[in-house]
């Protein structure tokens, strides 16, 4: 079993056995509508609870990208259209969150990609982004 499979297995077992977890929608600056698609995360939570037996609370919270409260959530959901901006403090907060094991799920409703990619590059300037192929094990949970 490779490292990704071990990590995925550990996460599935751990998340499945924890008490209910809160997830949050990430509020960000820049004028993009971070609040769009309000049912997306709720639908994802319902799917995960039903299909992989997680115990996530059905009502997601909302947290600002610069707020230390992001560390209270194992996963942040980011969505919207258009501009995204992270200032220096926000970048540091998100970087610390991600390096500490937090997960950021970015749902590009449409039109977000040209704005979010430079911000991701600012988060991790020394790391080259690569696309995960569709046949990667992470896409197969059953």
Give names to the regions the model predicted:
Residues 21-22, 27-31, 39-40, 113-142:
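An acidic, glycine-rich "communication" segment
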Residues 55-63, 106-109, 127-134:
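Surface-exposed patches in mature extracellular/periplasmic domains of secreted proteins
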Residues 23, 75-114:
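Short alpha-beta junction capping motif
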Residues 47-55, 79, 96-100, 119-126:
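Structured segments of extracytoplasmic/periplasmic soluble domains
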Residues 4-15:
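Sec-dependent N-terminal signal peptides
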Residues 39-43, 47, 89, 93, ...:
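Extracytoplasmic/secreted proteins, especially bacterial periplasmic and envelope-associated proteins
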Residues 66-67, 87, 136:
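Polar helix-capping/helix-linker motif
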Residues 19-75, 79-82:
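Aromatic-Pro/Gly-enriched surface loop or interdomain linker
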């Amino acid at each position: 079993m490779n490292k990704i499979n071990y990590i995925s297995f550990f996460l599935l077992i751990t998340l499945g056995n924890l008490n209910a977890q809160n997830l949050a929608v990430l509020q960000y600056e820049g004028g993009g509508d971070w609040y769009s698609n309000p049912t997306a995360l709720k639908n994802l939570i319902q799917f995960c609870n039903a299909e992989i037996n997680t115990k996530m609370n059905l009502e997601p919270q909302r947290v600002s990208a610069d707020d230390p409260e992001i560390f209270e959530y194992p996963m942040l959901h980011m969505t919207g259209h258009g501009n995204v901006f992270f200032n220096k403090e926000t970048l540091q907060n998100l970087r610390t969150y991600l390096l500490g094991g937090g997960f950021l799920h970015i749902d590009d409703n449409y039109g977000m990609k040209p704005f979010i990619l430079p911000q991701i590059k600012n988060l991790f300037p020394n790391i080259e982004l690569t696309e995960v192929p569709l046949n990667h094990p992470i896409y197969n949970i059953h």
